[in-house]
């Protein structure tokens, strides 16, 4: 065993800071994540740089703000020349692995929604130290490694490694029960017609009215969270007899919408057990323009509520989304428990730093809104962060 510590880095997608047992959620139980906090340090005011996915993930990897690394919003891949902390760890002798979601490149066919602002000719070039931000590599790319066309029907070309400093990748793209990447190929090996289990058109019956609530037909043991658990445990098995330290990022696509907790996790939590946030009721106060617009869209039946953008909800819809989100987080917590147990089986728990965080949050009823958008509300930019050092 190496005298250098290992790092096991758990990250979820679209996970508010207050949706953990250890952060005081009144209903949700997360005993395994809580156990990390109990032996480490939980940061109560941990804020991300942006209220959506790609800018924050690029900031996490580079330590630089979106205005510097260039991923200003979703649809802009992080430069393959960007120097990441995993590149530094790899160069220093750590084995590096990504199991799950990356989202450092585009995983939809949609590009940037806004052009990059023109460079002011009066600005000076970057000063000393800028060379640390980029890698001295020839060429640039490839940038199609998370493209859905690359992974269609379980057929894919090998990934170009290292991938932003990761020398081992088990990739998941997308969300809910329609996750792609290596997961799609794995699922095809389980079922002759796995596509018949995925998506709203194949869901099981239910009476929920919340937009994007899908009772998936995929069994728990074949849901993306279970795949990530399996691959993370396989990676720990591979590292057990290794003298090199490792850094493993275990990245869950949940609890990002659509709301698709499988099996027992679907109704593990009840809408009637949830409590609307105080900001759901605005009373007689006038709404700011963006909130008023969202309410008007809902009341007119004109709201687009099937995509990625913020939309308004009524009380019942918010409570259902909150309950389903708790179910998705509960499954992630169970997977984390299994992975931590695997770490202990191999005797690596005494030499492994364990971290838990997320890329951004979700309104989940704040101000009668759902999902995320270009607004720096606490529900979107405040995320969990737990660091448990080696004993």
Q: Which positions does each model-derived feature cover?
A:
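Formylglycine-dependent sulfatase
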Residues: 1-391
């Amino acid at each position: 065993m190496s005298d250098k510590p290992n790092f096991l880095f758990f990250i979820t997608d679209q996970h508010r800071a207050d949706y953990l047992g250890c952060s005081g959620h009144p209903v949700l139980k997360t005993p395994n994540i809580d156990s990390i906090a109990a032996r480490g340090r939980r940061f109560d005011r941990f804020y991300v740089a942006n209220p959506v996915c790609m800018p924050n993930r690029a900031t996490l990897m580079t330590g630089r703000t979106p205005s510097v690394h260039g991923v200003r919003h979703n649809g802009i891949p992080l430069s393959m020349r960007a120097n990441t902390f995993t590149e530094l760890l790899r160069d220093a002798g750590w084995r590096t692995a990504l199991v799950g979601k990356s989202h450092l490149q585009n995983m939809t066919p949609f590009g940037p929604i806004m052009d990059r602002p023109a460079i002011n000719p009066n600005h000076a070039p970057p000063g000393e130290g800028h060379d640390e931000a980029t890698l001295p590599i020839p060429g640039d790319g490839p940038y199609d490694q998370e493209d859905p066309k690359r992974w269609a029907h379980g057929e894919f070309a090998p990934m170009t490694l290292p991938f932003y400093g990761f020398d081992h990748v088990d990739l998941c793209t997308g969300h809910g029960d329609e996750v792609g990447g290596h997961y799609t190929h794995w699922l095809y090996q389980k079922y002759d017609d796995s596509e018949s289990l995925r998506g709203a058109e194949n869901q099981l019956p239910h009476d929920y009215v919340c937009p994007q609530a899908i009772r998936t037909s995929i069994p728990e043991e074949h849901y993306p969270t279970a795949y990530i658990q399996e691959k993370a445990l396989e990676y720990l098995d591979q590292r057990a007899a290794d003298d090199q330290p490792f850094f493993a990022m275990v990245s869950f696509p949940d609890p990002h919408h659509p709301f698709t907790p499988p099996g027992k996790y679907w109704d593990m939590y009840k809408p009637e057990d949830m409590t609307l946030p105080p900001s759901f009721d605005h009373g007689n106060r006038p709404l700011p323009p963006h909130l008023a617009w969202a309410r008007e869209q809902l009341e007119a039946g004109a709201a687009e509520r099937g995509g990625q953008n913020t939309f308004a909800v009524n009380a019942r819809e918010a409570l259902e989304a909150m309950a389903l989100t708790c179910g998705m987080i509960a499954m992630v917590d169970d997977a984390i428990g299994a992975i931590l147990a695997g770490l202990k089986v191999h005797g690596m728990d005494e030499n492994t730093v364990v971290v838990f965080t997320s890329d951004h949050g979700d309104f989940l009823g704040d101000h009668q809104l759902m999902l995320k958008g270009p607004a720096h509300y606490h529900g979107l930019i405040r995320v969990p962060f737990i660091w448990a050092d080696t004993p």
